[in-house]
């Protein structure tokens, strides 16, 4: 397990009024159960890979993250990022999974922050670092908030500074500690950019 890293948890300006209302608990329950099965399938597949194959996946991801550093404004110019979809594409676009013990959350992480990815779990924002850690990386992960039929990041506002969460990619598990909770506008990228020498993750709703 790697040492605790700093992270930024950003709560966007998505309305959270629905958080206080009752959800169709049965639908949410079964969706959460499906996520557990998906994660179990991913873990089983990952365990079947040789050490050499795992190292190859992670080396490609590290190289991708290094290439991001040379691109000017990759967040506002994602089409300039090449090789994204083919990197860390282990199982049907799933690159790993996120676990937040303090809110009992465990969700698969998929490429792109598209509606399809968010429906299935957590989406990774193209133009940000892949979530495999390392110096000068900043991965941004997003999910739905307040959906009636799935948990997503509905309880993200319950996180507090000092809480920890983990990201598992293949056989590699990274542990992060919450050090900031902010509200940002959708077009504000300053808090999502790479900070030299830091290993950051933003959870965005």
Q: What does each of the following model-derived ranges do?
A:
Residues 4-7, 14-205:
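Solvent-exposed, non-transmembrane regions of membrane-associated and secreted proteins
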């Amino acid at each position: 397990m790697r040492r605790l890293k700093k992270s930024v948890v950003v709560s966007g300006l998505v309305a959270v009024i629905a958080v206080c209302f009752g959800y169709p608990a049965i639908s949410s329950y079964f969706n959460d159960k499906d996520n557990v099965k998906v994660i179990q399938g991913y873990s089983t597949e990952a365990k079947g890979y040789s050490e050499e194959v795992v190292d190859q996946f992670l080396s490609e991801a590290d190289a991708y993250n290094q290439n991001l550093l040379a691109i000017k404004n990759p967040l506002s110019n994602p089409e300039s990022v090449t090789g994204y979809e083919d990197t860390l594409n282990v199982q049907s676009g799933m690159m790993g999974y996120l676990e937040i013990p303090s809110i009992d959350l465990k969700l698969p992480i998929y490429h792109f922050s598209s509606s399809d990815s968010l429906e299935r779990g957590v989406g990774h924002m193209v133009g940000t670092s892949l979530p495999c850690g390392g110096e000068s990386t900043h991965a941004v992960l997003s999910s739905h908030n307040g959906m009636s039929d799935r948990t997503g990041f509905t309880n993200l506002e319950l996180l507090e500074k000092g809480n920890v969460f983990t990201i598992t990619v293949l056989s590699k598990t990274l542990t992060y500690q919450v050090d900031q909770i902010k509200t940002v506008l959708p077009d504000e990228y300053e808090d999502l950019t790479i900070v030299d020498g830091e290993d950051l993750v933003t959870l965005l709703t």
